[in-house]
């Protein structure tokens, strides 16, 4: 941590799912600026990854919305507070600082000193699922890329592996005319059926009909690599081996392999932070949602307490009480309850000062 520039923060929220985003909002109302760290390259957590196009019916005041729509609404709600986002990063270490705050570092090399920390990591950090093929890891970052990682595609033979919205979107992006258009695009999935938004499925079909995208119903069973000159080590990935649904095998040449196999949650370093855990969840005090250490809070699916219900709306309640507790912790004194309908200070923080009261 000594080699990285230390970022000072009043609050750091670990996790950018709906509860983490609402935590930012509640902290903003208390006048506390927040930094947000998430392993995904975008905000939204489970809602964005697993329920983007699925309807949600139990958000108060919103009869129905998709996961994507809920994330967009929360993004709009926190905009006045301009949180600093540290995406595609996972917190690796968390330790007490001499002044009573917290020091932690991410796997991307960022180092932060936070006066308060809010663990809103859901069921854990979402990390891309990988392909369990011997030797493929040596090509990661040069020819093999996971999930939404940027990848060179211009003029290349691109193979996209996966059957959900990210795979479909990446295949379309590679096949569309433009400066990064691939020479060829092959979308490989175990069956010729895909889960994506209707407009993306329609565009995929159009690109298939025009010959810009080829779809193969198969599974990858191995890789093919050319030897590096002068050594027995493979220097370049040249293709993958496929087992088709009819039992036949074939080789598929490629320059770039995009693995869009979804993501899976991992509790990861949270388990090593010395917190009181019960079934991989952080035990909290329901008055403050403190994780047992002054200034450290846990909200949402990552916490547990008697009567716990893993619902988004329950997480919103937890984030509200945690923000009040943090404000009192930082101030060293009780914090007055204010209402957004009448408080001039809250309206100023929201950027709506002078707005009339209905």
Curated annotation (Swiss-Prot):
<dbReference type="GO" id="GO:0050660">
    <property type="term" value="F:flavin adenine dinucleotide binding"/>
</dbReference>
<dbReference type="InterPro" id="IPR023753">
    <property type="entry name" value="FAD/NAD-binding_dom"/>
</dbReference>
<dbReference type="GO" id="GO:0050661">
    <property type="term" value="F:NADP binding"/>
</dbReference>
<comment type="subunit">
    <text>Homodimer.</text>
</comment>
<feature type="binding site">
    <location>
        <position position="51"/>
    </location>
    <ligand>
        <name>FAD</name>
    </ligand>
</feature>
<feature type="binding site">
    <location>
        <position position="126"/>
    </location>
    <ligand>
        <name>FAD</name>
    </ligand>
</feature>
<dbReference type="GO" id="GO:0004324">
    <property type="term" value="F:ferredoxin-NADP+ reductase activity"/>
</dbReference>
<keyword id="KW-0285">Flavoprotein</keyword>
<feature type="binding site">
    <location>
        <position position="91"/>
    </location>
    <ligand>
        <name>FAD</name>
    </ligand>
</feature>
<protein>
    <recommendedName>
        <fullName>Ferredoxin--NADP reductase</fullName>
        <ecNumber>1.18.1.2</ecNumber>
    </recommendedName>
</protein>
<feature type="binding site">
    <location>
        <position position="341"/>
    </location>
    <ligand>
        <name>FAD</name>
    </ligand>
</feature>
<dbReference type="InterPro" id="IPR050097">
    <property type="entry name" value="Ferredoxin-NADP_redctase_2"/>
</dbReference>
<keyword id="KW-0560">Oxidoreductase</keyword>
<keyword id="KW-0521">NADP</keyword>
<dbReference type="InterPro" id="IPR036188">
    <property type="entry name" value="FAD/NAD-bd_sf"/>
</dbReference>
<feature type="binding site">
    <location>
        <position position="301"/>
    </location>
    <ligand>
        <name>FAD</name>
    </ligand>
</feature>
<keyword id="KW-0274">FAD</keyword>
<feature type="binding site">
    <location>
        <position position="46"/>
    </location>
    <ligand>
        <name>FAD</name>
    </ligand>
</feature>
<dbReference type="InterPro" id="IPR022890">
    <property type="entry name" value="Fd--NADP_Rdtase_type_2"/>
</dbReference>
<feature type="binding site">
    <location>
        <position position="38"/>
    </location>
    <ligand>
        <name>FAD</name>
    </ligand>
</feature>
<dbReference type="Pfam" id="PF07992">
    <property type="entry name" value="Pyr_redox_2"/>
</dbReference>
<comment type="similarity">
    <text>Belongs to the ferredoxin--NADP reductase type 2 family.</text>
</comment>
């Amino acid at each position: 941590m000594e080699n990285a520039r230390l970022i000072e923060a009043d609050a750091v929220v670990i996790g950018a799912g709906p509860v983490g985003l609402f935590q930012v909002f509640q902290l903003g109302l208390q006048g506390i600026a927040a930094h947000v760290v998430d392993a995904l390259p975008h905000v939204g957590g489970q809602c964005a990854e697993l329920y983007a196009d699925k309807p949600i019916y139990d958000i108060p005041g919103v009869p129905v919305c998709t996961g994507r729509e809920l994330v967009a609404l929360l993004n709009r709600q926190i905009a006045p507070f301009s949180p600093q986002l540290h995406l595609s990063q996972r917190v690796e270490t968390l330790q007490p600082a001499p002044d009573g705050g917290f020091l932690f570092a991410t796997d991307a090399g960022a180092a932060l000193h936070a006066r308060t920390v809010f663990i809103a990591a859901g069921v854990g950090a979402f990390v891309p699922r990988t392909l369990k093929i011997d030797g493929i890891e040596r090509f990661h970052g040069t020819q093999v890329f996971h999930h939404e990682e940027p990848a060179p595609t211009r003029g290349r033979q691109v193979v996209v592996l996966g059957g959900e919205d990210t795979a479909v979107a990446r295949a379309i992006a590679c096949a569309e005319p433009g400066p990064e258009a691939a020479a060829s695009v092959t979308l490989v999935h175990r069956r010729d059926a895909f889960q994506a938004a209707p407009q993306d499925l329609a565009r995929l079909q159009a690109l298939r009909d025009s010959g810009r995208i080829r779809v193969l119903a198969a599974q990858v069973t191995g890789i093919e690599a050319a030897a590096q000159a002068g050594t027995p080590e493979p220097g370049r990935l040249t293709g993958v081996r496929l087992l088709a649904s009819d039992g036949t095998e074939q080789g598929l040449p490629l320059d770039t392999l995009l693995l869009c196999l979804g993501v899976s949650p991992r509790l990861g370093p949270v388990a090593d932070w010395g917190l009181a855990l019960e079934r991989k969840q952080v035990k909290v005090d329901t008055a403050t949602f403190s994780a047992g250490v002054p200034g450290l809070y846990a909200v949402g699916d990552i916490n547990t307490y008697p009567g716990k219900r893993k619902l988004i709306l329950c997480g919103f309640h937890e984030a509200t009480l945690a923000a009040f507790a943090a404000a009192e912790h930082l101030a060293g004194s009780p914090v007055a309850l204010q209402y957004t309908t009448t408080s001039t200070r809250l309206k100023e923080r929201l950027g709506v000062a002078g707005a009339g009261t209905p």
